[in-house]
Design a protein with these regions (language model features):
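Flexible, low-hydrophobicity surface segments
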Residues: 1-175, 198-201, 482, 777
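Glycine-rich loop/linker segments at domain edges
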Residues: 26, 32-38, 104-110, 175-218, ...
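Short acidic, glycine/serine/threonine-rich loops at helix termini
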Residues: 94-99, 141-144, 233, 242-244, ...
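Short beta-strand elements
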Residues: 41, 217-222, 311-320, 326-331, ...
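Extended active-site and interfacial segments that coordinate phosphate-rich ligands
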Residues: 34-35, 143-150, 156, 236-238, ...
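Helix-loop-helix junctions that connect adjacent transmembrane helices in secondary transporters/permeases
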Residues: 100, 163-249, 419-508, 642, ...
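Thiamine diphosphate
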Residues: 266-288, 292-294, 522-529
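C-terminal catalytic domains of large/alpha subunits in multi-subunit enzymes
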Residues: 2, 87-88, 250-255, 285-293, ...
Length: 799
């Protein structure tokens, strides 16, 4: 019988704290943090290559217009300007694309070009590009490029996008519909007819975007002698970009190298294909020299993908025992003029349909999603894709139903949540669920919050004229996606990840992983897993990420998959390497491999006899192989890959609560406390998990209370700067209390699920419900996010 690595007795139970070099489950400081805090990071903009030129884009000042002419003659005469390109030049070397996925039904997305062709369809769309000695010269020359436009009425309102007389953005499509989908499970009409109580609401979610510390940036360097393209890019998925650049610039994929340097945040913003970045690569190929483009902050607001932008109607029916018997939603979303490539702009709506009511037992479920085009910045996936909308509509209706039935909202949820012993099961929409713990999480949340005390606090505050409210919400979170998410639809997006691990001649360990790092601590958890499974000190483990020439093929970092998929690949490769080490050591030490183990960088005998260091073993293999018996396998490097099979995602679940104070005179909202109980399976580094949840909550606060991309009636983005686009800062951060339930994923040895998006997905619902709880005594509610002071005062009838 073939020996399986997972069966070897030297593989310890994960998180064995009584064992030397046990790192899984420990809050180990991340090594990379020291480098970044000392200002020694290496970001795209830090790189300067010989002969490098700089780009500045001339962008459309209009939301919708026809391009009549482009005159570049004056700008080309500026000293230091090398070239000025329009789509006529760029399309010769870079083909256009369509943002569609084959498995989600008909998507009607027009072809998108790297630069605008004939028409501009959002304010900020790139029309031409100036190539100059430096960015300042390029910007000055851009002022001299003369573009004549014929302005066209902009279609901005998603609610009128399909009206009979509306402006059609792409005439060839006949209307402004991109995609629609309907889910229909059970008999929704009969269920509502027979319902004891029916509640309904409509919620609005404003557009907002991810404001990363580092803006998007790219350096492309075409080497014509080797026909090789090297790209320095601050993205999340190097192998995806390698495939796409190779395809659209007609380069052999193996001759495209993507290097992701240090990346200053992403949140999903940097996992998409942007026209300006493809132009940079095309210009490098045309000019045969390095090209740099760094988006400035004004460009970021008008060109980085936006998100949310939903209006959703929901209806919930219960029987006379307070059991949910019917749930229906109708979601409308506007995505800008194009579906973003290659992930498409349908996924957020698709996740709303999949995830609404996903925590609850719902026998009859109907959901419709409609996605339309607008003359605004393109919209696509951003942290917690679809979750804030799905969770908010679900939990708003659950609160309403509990109130209508005169049942405590905690008890109402307990009576309707999927039981913890019911798995495997499915969401109301039919998506498989495994290994969740809604009841355990909500019970722990109740104890953390001390709900009885909160009720007393509310009443006492009201006597003093202060309006307090609190909430309880439940959610599921999509993590660890499989090929059934994107690959099945034909997108060049890998769902598997790989890891290579090598024992160096010094006895140190080198890990190479296809996962990438944008600040979440990926490098640290890879070190921990490798050190734990090999039995070495973590200081001896070095990690390489983000280079398609030196790392195994894989998907990179998105959808909370780094630990669950990339970490599993490292674990498997570590166990294989350890197995090889012990086999070689057994030959050298003339014993059985099962009598040996690796601890503290040494191969040790379990009976306490003399062992040998990993350095000694490595140098014997690498330098003195003649000392090994013939036939000994000297392999001290192993590679392993991992992917989820059979289901589209591995889900996690959370329960959250929020306490707010609403000032009814000013409309100001203060979050006094926030609680989150998360079940993400095995926690490799609890401190990093806590940081992810807290950071996610703060981004959720941004969407709930502050962040909105505001457009005027002509399609001009009026708050595209850091002064006018509000984000939560240190003062707005409440006390966030995090706790956990641990239900390991049965899909892997490591048992890890994702934790990066729960806070962002759940916080908006928790905040909205808490605000409405505070306003309940006034018999008013708010149904639009962000919940600004103005909206509070309007609801109260004060303005």
């Amino acid at each position: 019988m073939e020996l399986k690595i997972d069966d070897l007795n030297q593989n310890p139970k994960l998180g064995s704290s009584d064992r030397p070099n046990s790192y899984i489950g420990r809050s180990v400081p991340r090594e990379r943090a020291k480098k970044l805090l000392e200002g020694k990071g290496n970001y795209v903009d830090d790189i300067a290559l010989p002969r490098m030129v700089h780009l500045n884009f001339i962008r459309s000042p209009f939301a919708h217009a026809k391009i009549i002419s482009i005159n570049i003659s004056k700008a080309k005469n500026v000293s230091g300007v090398y070239e000025i390109f329009t789509i006529k030049d760029i399309e010769k070397v870079c083909t256009p694309w369509n943002g569609v996925l084959g498995h989600l039904g008909e998507m009607r997305s027009p072809t998108q070009f790297p630069l605008a062709k004939d028409f501009v369809r959002w304010q900020g769309e790139p029309v031409a590009v100036v190539v100059a000695k430096n960015r300042a010269i390029a910007e000055d020359a851009s002022e001299l490029v003369e573009i004549d436009y014929q302005e066209i009425d902009a279609q901005l309102d998603m609610e009128t996008a399909l009206s009979e007389n509306t402006q059609i953005i792409h005439k060839e499509l006949g209307n402004n519909l991109f995609w629609t989908r309907t889910v229909d499970q059970g008999n929704i009409n009969d269920a509502f007819k027979n319902a004891y109580k029916v509640v309904e609401t409509t919620l609005d979610f404003a557009r907002h975007t991810g404001v990363t510390l580092e803006s998007r940036g790219i350096i492309a360097d075409w080497n014509s002698s080797e026909e090789k393209m090297t790209v320095y890019h601050n993205g999340q998925a190097p192998h995806m970009m390698q495939s796409i650049i190779a395809k659209h610039l007609q380069i052999s994929e193996g001759l495209v190298r993507i290097i992701s340097c240090d990346v200053g945040g992403s949140f999903g913003i940097k996992v998409h294909v942007y026209p300006d970045e493809m132009v940079a690569v095309a210009v490098s190929k045309i000019m045969n020299r390095p090209v740099k483009y760094i988006a400035d902050r004004l460009e970021s607001y008008s060109t980085d993908i936006h998100s949310r932008c939903h209006k959703i109607y929901g209806k919930l029916g219960v029987d006379d025992k307070g059991k949910i018997i019917a749930f229906e939603i109708d979601d409308l979303s506007g995505i800008g003029p194009y579906s973003v490539y290659p992930r498409t702009s349908a996924i957020e709506t698709n996740q709303v349909l999949n995830l609404s009511a996903a925590s609850y037992v719902v026998p009859n479920y109907k959901a419709k999603g409609t996605v339309v085009f607008q003359n605004k910045t393109p919209m696509c996936q951003y942290r917690a894709v679809g979750h804030p909308i799905a969770v908010a509509i679900t939990e708003a209706l659950v609160d309403k139903a509990a109130s209508e039935c005169n049942i405590d909202r905690f008890e109402f949820r307990k009576n309707n949540l999927i039981p913890d012993n019911a798995y495997p099961t499915k969401t109301p929409s039919g998506v498989p669920l495994e290994d969740l713990s809604h009841h355990a999480c909500i019970e722990k949340l109740k104890k953390l919050m001390n709900i009885d005390e909160l009720e007393r606090y509310k009443k006492e505050s009201l006597i003093k004229g202060r309006y307090k409210g609190f909430s309880i919400i439940n959610m599921v979170e999509v993590t660890n996606p499989s090929p059934l998410f994107y690959g099945v639809g034909g997108a060049p997006i890998s769902s598997q990840d790989g890891a290579s691990i090598r024992l160096e001649g010094s006895g140190a360990v080198h890990v190479s992983s296809s996962i990438t790092e944008q600040g979440q601590g990926t490098e640290a958890i890879m070190q921990q897993i490798a050190a734990d499974q090999l039995g070495v000190n973590i200081d001896t483990v070095r990690v390489t990420l983000g280079d398609t020439d030196t790392t195994p093929y894989g998907g990179g970092t998105w959808a909370s998959r780094g630990a669950g998929i990339g970490g599993e690949a490292v674990l498997k490769a570590s166990r294989q390497l350890k197995n090889n080490i012990l086999k070689i050591a057994a030959v050298i030490m003339q014993t059985k491999e099962n009598d040996l183990d690796v601890r503290d960088d040494n191969v040790v005998r379990k009976d306490g006899g003399k062992g040998m260091s990993l350095k000694e073993l490595a140098q014997t293999v690498y330098y003195r192989g003649h000392e090994l018996p013939p036939g000994t396998n000297p392999e001290l490097i192993t590679t392993s890959s991992f992917l989820i099979e059979g289901i589209p995602f591995v889900f996690t679940n959370s329960a959250m609560g929020c306490l707010v104070d609403v000032d009814i005179d000013t409309g100001l909202i203060k979050i006094e406390k926030f609680w989150a109980v998360e079940d993400c399976g095995t926690q490799i580094n609890p401190k990093l998990v806590e940081e992810q949840i807290k950071g996610g909550v703060v981004q959720g606060i941004g969407g709930a209370l502050y962040e909105e991309n505001i457009y005027d009636e002509y399609g001009n983005l009026v708050n595209g700067n850091m002064a006018d686009y509000l984000v939560p800062m240190a003062y707005e951060m409440p006390d966030i209390i995090v706790d956990h339930v641990v239900t390991n994923s049965g899909r892997s040895i490591l048992g890890a699920k994702g934790a990066g998006e729960a806070g962002t997905g759940g916080a908006p619902a928790a905040i909205m419900n808490a605000v409405n709880d505070a306003l309940k005594v006034k018999n008013v509610e708010v149904t639009s996010q962000p919940i600004t002071p103005e909206k509070i005062l309007i609801a109260l009838g004060k303005i």
